[in-house]
Amino acid sequence: MLQEAIKKIVLKENLDEKEAYEVMGEIMSGNGTPSLIGGLLIGLRLKGESVEEITGFAKAMRDNAVKLQLDADYVIDTCGTGGDGGKTFNISTAVAIIASAAGVKVAKHGNRAVSSKSGSADVLRELGFNIEAEPMYTKKMIEEKGMGFLFAPLYHRAMKNVLPIRRELGTRTVFNLLGPLTNPAPIKGQVLGVYDRNLTHPIAEVLLKLGIERAMVVHGFDGLDEITTTAPTYVSEVKEGEIFDYVIDPLDFDIPYSKPEDLKGKGPRENAEIIIDILKGQKGPRRDIVVLNTAAALYVGKLVENLKEGVELAERLLNSGLAYERFLEILGYQRRIIS
């Protein structure tokens, strides 16, 4: 199936959803050689991935993942595709912690760095979390403390053969898109940053096909896979079975423009320190971008009616110290239940 798929893709022909599902199934079964998988990934990158292809791949990965069943009505994820070249600190990881302090339940799905210096797993480990906690512990963390981390290799075990190929290619591939689309938890809301402006609407279409109730798929005018504060941001919102495309500007929320260099991160240790400083109330451009993205998480989490309310709530959580308290609670709870 892989060879046939590559032949189609080389001719710039799209796979349908069923074909894509079968191709991913073959990869996960371990039958795909590194050269075939690499050829498929590069071919898709050059052609451009279709909605049907991404949906089929995502459904196959979800069906073959270790499922995390939760006793919670509404759970969200906050993540980006990566591959934007922005080299920012781990914004969505900070957002997940703050959103949980507001009462939103967050199943943060992520991995170690592949095409960046610091993935969500890297920075969470530096913050003191056991990123390889068994699913039963992560389930308790989400249900009791509002946030847990789902380390992708623990849940997508069949993908272990793909990671070395991704690292060797050293460029973004369809797997940058699939990571955020294959959360093993039953999430219903999502803030998803993408590396290309032309992906916001197609990825919103995929989310609809995957059963997401409310989402914001975002891409900054500056290229970031976040809601940026250096410029406006493109948004494709999923709400009540429809997709709405619009642009938001940080100035609309009384957040000043920042400079790209103000948002840069470094390695996991430095990024962890940045997150701690923000949670402790430090002000500045880094806090501003976290606040705006937290507002989006609170909105897709159905805790606020709009982003303006979300910004106000995020500011209160940081100013009051509640966000930092929640971070310590989550960390302490994980250590207690695992020990």
From Swiss-Prot:
Cross-referenced Pfam families: Glycos_trans_3N, Glycos_transf_3
GO BP annotations listed: L-tryptophan biosynthetic process
Source species: Caldanaerobacter subterraneus subsp. tengcongensis (strain DSM 15242 / JCM 11007 / NBRC 100824 / MB4) (Thermoanaerobacter tengcongensis)
Keywords: Amino-acid biosynthesis, Aromatic amino acid biosynthesis, Glycosyltransferase, Magnesium, Metal-binding, Transferase, Tryptophan biosynthesis
E.C. no: 2.4.2.18
Function: Catalyzes the transfer of the phosphoribosyl group of 5-phosphorylribose-1-pyrophosphate (PRPP) to anthranilate to yield N-(5'-phosphoribosyl)-anthranilate (PRA).
GO molecular function, one term: magnesium ion binding
Binding site residues for anthranilate 1: G80, N111
HAMAP family, sorted: TrpD
Subunit-level organization: Homodimer.
Cofactor binding note from Swiss-Prot or TrEMBL: Binds 2 magnesium ions per monomer.
Binding-site list for 5-phospho-alpha-D-ribose 1-diphosphate: 80, 83-84, 88, 90-93, 108-116, 120
Entry protein name: Anthranilate phosphoribosyltransferase
Root EC class: transferase
Positions annotated to bind anthranilate 2: R166
Entry GO terms, CC: cytosol
Keyword presence, Signal: no
UniProt keyword Transcription, yes or no: no
Required co-factors: Mg(2+)
Binding of Mg(2+) 1, residues: S92, E226
Catalytic activity: N-(5-phospho-beta-D-ribosyl)anthranilate + diphosphate = 5-phospho-alpha-D-ribose 1-diphosphate + anthranilate
Entry's family note: Belongs to the anthranilate phosphoribosyltransferase family.
